């Protein structure tokens, strides 16, 4: 029995090291004001609830909403061009799953090129 306890105690630092580096994601902001505009194209995003994406700066408590993945990625590549912080400050990117419409972390999503399904901007 003692042997098993020591094995667990020896593995514990390894497990902590593996998972400690992974930052916990906060929940996405779910409330979008009716007058909220996409910082990239200027469209009203609340009209396109199924396509809304968001970028969050948790340190500054700021959220930017977009009318689709395309504008989210344009913003992510050069956020300062659209009034955002440096790219390293964008801690979270969120998109909606196409079928369930639930928020998922954008870095975990699978994106399809050449689909016949178009978002609000084509």
Predicted regions and their residues:
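Thiol/selenol-based redox catalytic cores and closely related redox-interacting motifs
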Residues: 85-122
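Sec/Tat signal peptide C-region and signal peptidase I cleavage site
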Residues: 20-26
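A generic signature of intrinsically disordered, low-complexity regions enriched in glycine/proline
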Residues: 7-8, 25, 101
């Amino acid at each position: 029995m003692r042997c098993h306890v020591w094995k667990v105690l020896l593995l514990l630092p390894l497990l902590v090291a593996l998972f400690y580096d992974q930052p916990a994601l906060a929940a996405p902001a779910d409330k979008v004001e009716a007058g909220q505009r996409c910082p990239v194209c200027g469209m009203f995003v609340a009209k396109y609830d199924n396509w809304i994406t968001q970028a969050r700066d948790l340190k500054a408590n700021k959220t930017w909403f977009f009318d689709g993945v395309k504008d989210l990625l344009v913003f992510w590549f050069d956020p300062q061009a659209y009034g955002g912080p440096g790219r390293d400050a964008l801690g979270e990117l969120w998109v909606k799953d196409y079928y369930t419409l639930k928020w998922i972390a954008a870095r975990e999503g699978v994106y399809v090129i050449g689909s016949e399904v178009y978002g609000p901007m084509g």
